[in-house]
């Protein structure tokens, strides 16, 4: 499958843990994707925006990404049962 995939992942650092979490972002290897950017939202969340050429790129980083998330889990508030609030999908060419 050659469809371009975009993902948006939100993280909510616990109070007082934001600097450590932001430092930890630099240890996440995202060299397998086209674009990886972080923004700090006004509500305190850290938002990751990722562009991948295809689903194979997404899968290539999945294990390492989950291991990294495990390593920073203690720094994060949860979204219900989840450590992140994430969504992904493919580009709509005709829009």
Show which residues each predicted segment covers.
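Short, surface-exposed ligand-recognition loops at beta-strand->loop->(often short) alpha-helix junctions
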Residues: 10-23
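Active-site-flanking beta-strand signature of metal-NTP-handling nucleotidyl enzymes
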Residues: 4-11, 49
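Acidic/histidine-enriched, glycine/proline-rich intrinsically disordered or flexible terminal extensions
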Residues: 85-95
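An amphipathic, aromatic/His-enriched active-site/gating alpha helix that lines ligand/cofactor pockets
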Residues: 27-37, 51-86
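A short beta-turn/loop motif at secondary-structure boundaries
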Residues: 38-43
């Amino acid at each position: 499958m050659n469809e371009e995939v975009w993902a948006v992942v939100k993280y909510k650092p616990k109070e007082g843990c934001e600097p450590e979490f932001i430092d930890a972002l630099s240890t996440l290897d995202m060299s397998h994707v086209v674009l990886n950017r972080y923004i700090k939202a006004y509500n305190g969340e850290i938002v990751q925006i990722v562009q991948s050429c295809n689903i194979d790129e997404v899968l290539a980083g999945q294990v390492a990404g989950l291991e990294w998330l495990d390593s920073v889990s203690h720094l994060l508030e949860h979204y219900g049962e989840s450590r992140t609030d994430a969504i992904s999908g493919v580009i709509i060419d005709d829009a």
